[in-house]
Swiss-Prot record:
Annotated binding of ADP-alpha-D-glucose, by residue: K15
Protein's name in the database: Glycogen synthase
Entry EC no(s): 2.4.1.21
Disulfide cysteine pairs (residue numbers): none
Spans traversing the lipid bilayer: none
Function description: Synthesizes alpha-1,4-glucan chains using ADP-glucose.
Pathway: Glycan biosynthesis; glycogen biosynthesis
GO terms, molecular function: alpha-1,4-glucan glucosyltransferase (ADP-glucose donor) activity; alpha-1,4-glucan glucosyltransferase (UDP-glucose donor) activity
Family: Belongs to the glycosyltransferase 1 family. Bacterial/plant glycogen synthase subfamily.
Catalytic activity: [(1->4)-alpha-D-glucosyl](n) + ADP-alpha-D-glucose = [(1->4)-alpha-D-glucosyl](n+1) + ADP + H(+)
The keyword Plastid is annotated on this UniProt entry: no
Organism: Prochlorococcus marinus (strain NATL2A)
Pfam families for this protein: Glyco_transf_5, Glycos_transf_1
Keywords: Glycogen biosynthesis, Glycosyltransferase, Transferase
Length: 487
């Protein structure tokens, strides 16, 4: 199949959130399945110095009364074709924000539609979040191009209909209060980035006032879990780590922990329980919960905490105040540093994700891959990826709590701190977490099935061996083979 990905981000060149990881990693996994996959993104200013781009455009056109050009280049990691929409509105290095954000991304969606109609015509046009939300609306009139719309974060919904009428052409048949709603209505298939999140957004608690619409379109809505690039994120080959390690020998983590403590200005002590946090410092990520329990946690335990990220100024200053109050035990780096994030994954004992909501989450997957035990709230993709630890039967890969309440989070933190003192069981917990492999290959097969479904391509009947596999590739119990179930 010919598949075109349209998005505002693509890792590693342009990455702000999880969407960049998906757009950067899912296409090569689909290519391995034999599909012709290409990407189209805005031609941001920084890309012209980062990438080798052909000087002459491959396509020129006009939309929304503005001329634009499309240039071709290659993805630096996997070599897939990437098309860049060139226009002065994308010349700055800014990705999001600004008074012209609604116009810029509506223009981008319109340019992508013109390109798909008149240049490289895909069978499936895969759109990501509100930035490309008008594409399914316009493609609704073209029976030769099917559209898939992926919801990465329902909270960001794009410009409202009254503003869209002012900046672009809205078809007579268009319904929906804003870009996100219209995209979900007119896309041939809609998916969220985890099965649990696809169910949660159909409720008033997580639906962002779109739960009625999402229940209305539930027949074409599904949840497909994100994955991790197991080659890029591999502690056995990661050159960012002072000491490499693997599930067969995790002794290198002790060296990484010492280096992390030194770099973050913490007391260098291998026996201290070190917790890490990497990500955007916003309410969604549960930073307010951490602020509410930090004083009690640091008073009751001998734990250490490191936080890496940027975001809300109030939350940044509050975290900085804790670092001043607890020198050597609480450290904050208000920036994003890829090498330091890998050191936190590979050196911290535990990883904090007390999210208010979490569509999927990549950080908990990376943490488990690197042996940092996740402490998460049971919400969204965290439910699908982190199995609660049960010391009685020695199962699970992390510590989980239900309610978005400080006492629940604090209880999980103390419970993990106490478990850390039992190093034998803690090491087994680490090994189980590191053995989880949420690769993009599994996710790509689920997306492939959705693409074939929307294009009307019938799948051959699976053989008996395939029927006996669980959805995540685990083999069925051999002792049950050949046994019949009595009805």
């Amino acid at each position: 199949m010919r598949i075109l990905f349209a998005a505002a981000e693509c890792a590693p060149m342009i990455k702000v959130g999880g969407m960049g990881d998906v757009v950067g990693s899912l296409p090569p996994a689909l290519k391995k399945l034999g599909h012709d996959v290409r990407l189209i993104i805005p031609g941001y200013g920084k890309l012209w110095t980062l990438m080798d781009i052909a000087p002459e455009p491959i396509f020129r056109s006009n939309t929304m009364g503005v001329d634009f050009s499309v240039f071709e280049t290659k993805h630096p990691s996997n070599g897939l074709p990437i098309y860049l929409v060139g226009h002065p509105c994308f010349d700055s290095e800014r990705i999001y924000g600004g008074e012209d954000e609604d116009w810029r991304f509506t223009f981008f969606a319109s340019a992508v539609s013109e390109f798909a109609w008149n240049s490289w015509k895909p069978q499936v046009l895969h759109c990501h979040d509100w930035h490309t939300g008008m594409i399914p609306v316009w493609m609704h009139q073209d029976p030769e191009i099917s559209t898939v719309f992926t919801i990465h974060n329902l909270k960001y919904q794009g410009p409202w209909r009254w503003k869209l009428d002012q900046i672009t052409w809205c078809p007579w048949y268009m319904h929906g209060d804003h870009t996100m709603a219209s995209a979900m209505l007119y896309a041939d298939r809609v998916n969220a980035v985890s099965p649990t999140y696809s169910r949660e957004i159909r409720t008033s608690e997580y639906g962002e006032k779109l739960e009625g619409l999402l229940n209305y379109i539930s027949g074409k809505l599904r949840g497909i879990l994100n994955g991790v690039d197991l080659d890029e994120w591999n502690p056995a080959t990661d050159n960012s780590l002072p000491a490499k390690f693997s599930v067969d020998n995790i002794s290198g983590r002790a060296i990484n922990k010492r280096v992390l403590q030194e770099r973050m200005g913490l007391e260098v002590n291998p026996d201290k329980y070190l917790m890490g946090m990497v990500g955007r410092l916003v309410d969604q990520k549960g930073i307010d919960l951490l602020l509410q329990v930090a004083n009690r946690l640091l008073s009751y335990t001998d734990s250490q905490v490191v936080v890496l990220g940027t975001g809300d100024r109030y939350l940044e200053s509050s975290l900085w105040q804790l670092a001043i109050e607890y020198p050597g035990r609480f450290s904050v780096f208000l920036t994003y540093d890829d090498a330091l994030s890998r050191l936190i994954y590979g050196g911290a004992d535990a990883f904090l994700m007390p999210s208010r909501f979490e569509p999927c989450g990549i950080s908990q997957l990376l943490a488990m891959r690197y042996g940092a035990i996740p402490i998460v709230r049971k919400v969204g993709g965290l439910v699908d990826t982190v199995e609660p630890y049960n010391p009685m039967n020695e199962t699970g890969s992390g510590f989980c709590f239900d309610r978005y309440e400080p006492i629940d989070f604090y209880t999980s933190l103390v419970r993990s701190w106490e478990e850390y003192r039992h190093q034998k069981s803690w090491k087994q917990l680490q090994l189980r977490a590191m053995s989880n492999k949420y690769s993009w290959d599994r996710s790509a097969k689920e997306y492939e099935l959705m693409y074939k479904d929307v294009c009307g391509i019938k799948e051959p009947s699976p053989d008996a061996a395939e029927v006996e596999k669980f959805s995540y590739g685990q083999e069925a119990d051999p002792s049950r083979k050949g046994k019949k179930i009595k009805l």
